[in-house]
UniProtKB/Swiss-Prot annotation:
Pfam family for this entry, one: DHquinase_II
Protein name: 3-dehydroquinate dehydratase
Family assignment from sequence similarity: Belongs to the type-II 3-dehydroquinase family.
Binding site for substrate: 76, 82, 89, 103-104, 113
HAMAP family tied to this protein: AroQ (MF_00169)
GO biological process: amino acid biosynthetic process; aromatic amino acid family biosynthetic process; chorismate biosynthetic process; quinate catabolic process
Pathway noted in the entry: Metabolic intermediate biosynthesis; chorismate biosynthesis; chorismate from D-erythrose 4-phosphate and phosphoenolpyruvate: step 3/7
Organism: Acaryochloris marina (strain MBIC 11017)
Residue numbers marked as site, Transition state stabilizer: 20
Enzyme category, top tier: lyase
GN (gene name): aroQ
Annotated EC: 4.2.1.10
Length: 149
């Protein structure tokens, strides 16, 4: 397989990481997470592109635009995980292998966070490992892509 390209999508309020509820989400900023992923992507020999939006439609547009450009999607839809049929449907429509990640363990939080519209259509879900959830998700996604060829 040639060098795979991965789209990393960050959902609403993730731009506030580092200052937003550090007891839940930790003190690592989104910029630091992206830097860590860039370093990991280099060692995994993949290309990576980042996009963050607080707007559902923009995330849907990014998913649709990934078709033909990216081999995989690493997504933290944040609060949209629990509410967005549109993001779920966009992921299903493009059928690009995807991994869902969350900083916190969504199943140890409020009841409304226990349901993910995204989980049934992605390869897998990683949650509860803080910023490392992203790294674990990227490793799993690349492994999946390499073993499917």
């Amino acid at each position: 397989m040639s060098r795979p390209s991965i789209l990393v999508l960050h959902g609403p309020n993730l731009n506030l990481l580092g200052q937003r509820e550090p007891g839940i989400y930790g003190s690592v900023t989104l910029e630091k997470i992206n830097q860590q992923l860039l370093s990991l992507a280099e060692s995994l020999k993949c290309n990576i592109e980042f996009y963050q939006s607080n707007h559902e439609g923009n995330l849907v547009d990014s998913i649709q635009e990934a078709l033909g450009c990216h081999n995989g999607i690493l997504i933290n839809a944040a609060a949209y995980t629990h509410t967005s049929v549109a993001i779920r449907d966009a992921l299903a429509a493009v059928a690009i292998p995807a991994v869902e990640v969350h900083l916190s363990n969504i199943y140890r939080r409020e009841d409304f966070r226990h349901h993910s519209f995204i989980a049934p259509i992605v390869i897998g879900q990683i949650s509860g490992f803080g910023a490392q959830s992203y790294s674990l998700g990227l490793q799993a996604l690349i492994h999946h892509l390499q073993t499917q060829t």
